[in-house]
Amino acid sequence: MANVTTDIKRNDTVAVTSGKDKGKQGRVLRVIPDKGRILVEHVGMVKNHVKPNPQKNIKGGIAEQESAIAISNVALVCAKCGPTRVAHKGEGKQKSRVCAKCGSDLTGK
């Protein structure tokens, strides 16, 4: 995938629509548009073996962290009606993201 355009931004709340974490909701930590992937808080958890490093004050062991999932596997969550698609309202710089179901503003999320 190369440079996917998306309406999902950092700190948005999204719901996972497919995969092993289907049904979970979380906050977007990072969007990686050139790979078409997204990091969602507490979704796609993997175990990472960490080597101790006393200089950086890092304790060794097995750490859990989020792994990236495909942007196509998530849907933006509207506060009123739940997971939804995104519509756009306005022109030019006045353009804003709105819920496709109920029309409420999603920009302030």
UniProtKB/Swiss-Prot annotation:
Gene3D superfamilies: 2.30.30.30
GO biological process, alphabetically ordered: translation
rRNA-binding among keywords: yes
Molecular functions (GO terms): rRNA binding; structural constituent of ribosome
UniProt GO cellular component terms: ribonucleoprotein complex; ribosome
Listed InterPro entries: KOW, Rib_uL2_dom2, Ribosomal_uL24, Ribosomal_uL24_KOW, Translation_prot_SH3-like_sf
Annotated spans, Disordered: 1-24
UniProt keyword list: Ribonucleoprotein, Ribosomal protein, RNA-binding, rRNA-binding
Listed HAMAP family: Ribosomal_uL24_B
Annotated function: One of two assembly initiator proteins, it binds directly to the 5'-end of the 23S rRNA, where it nucleates assembly of the 50S subunit. One of the proteins that surrounds the polypeptide exit tunnel on the outside of the subunit.
Quaternary structure, from the entry: Part of the 50S ribosomal subunit.
Name recorded for this polypeptide: Large ribosomal subunit protein uL24
Annotated source species: Koribacter versatilis (strain Ellin345)
